[in-house]
């Protein structure tokens, strides 16, 4: 590391100093050097951070925009940043995130958490628009005002503050006739969760942004509670290892995992991965407090099904049989292995399930929606067998 251009940064929890490191944030080399760990505050270090130079680097990388995000190059180029300089993104946005209350403070900045945090301070609507559409002019603004730089996922999305609350807007994929239906699945999956009694985030549909259909949901974290994806706490061993870990946390965590397996089998969620479920952390104590609500169901309920399926039951059935879960082998086997008496009661409610078409002015065509309803009912029957 070239000492003459290296800068010292401190990872903080609110304003509490946790760890100071030195790095050249403008270099392609992501090496860093730990200067100090504040032992008196060690209990407040991020639960998903390993105290080593490689561990700090991994933790920082989790706080930058993913390379597969829609419009990522457009967003970064408009503010003079590059994916090839991940630590430069951290330096610019202070490592701030709407997942938690940690941040990365440059030596001598004079900043405080109150001054820069994303929960209380205004977002840049210009940057939000670029993040969602890919269009916009180059701008000079504080990147600490843009939560998009630390939001995961590949779909176009942005955050907006409305009436004192923070909402995530998320679009769909585009380019082919079978794409762009993810927002509908977010809405309809929530309706299934409601009937089952599963703890899931509420989604609505809107065309508020650029007249493009997108899903909208309220932020579920706050200055009181953080979110950690389970994959950052359990790094190997799959669902079995996660179950064993949850058993150490308490029965409510085990119940939540079992409910998720049943729910995902019903909605045929092909994109449940170790980044979109996890735990909530009490920020006052930095301890795990509860299972996080379920979210991110755009790749469920056959959102990628081709237009030829919706008037052809045989073709749809054949297509549905090809869909598999991402994190384990089989929807029904995993759900049945986790079934408890309470799940039978949940599933009985789905035997005559119908979507609430009155919940939105934007609905799928009746033939498509009816076929999905029938499949939800069928999958409930399979689990009850």
Regions found by a protein language model. Give the residues of each.
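Conserved protein-kinase catalytic-loop segment immediately C-terminal to the catalytic Asp
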Residues: 273, 278-280
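Phosphate/dinucleotide-binding and metal-coordinating scaffold of catalytic cores
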Residues: 1-262, 266-268, 280-385
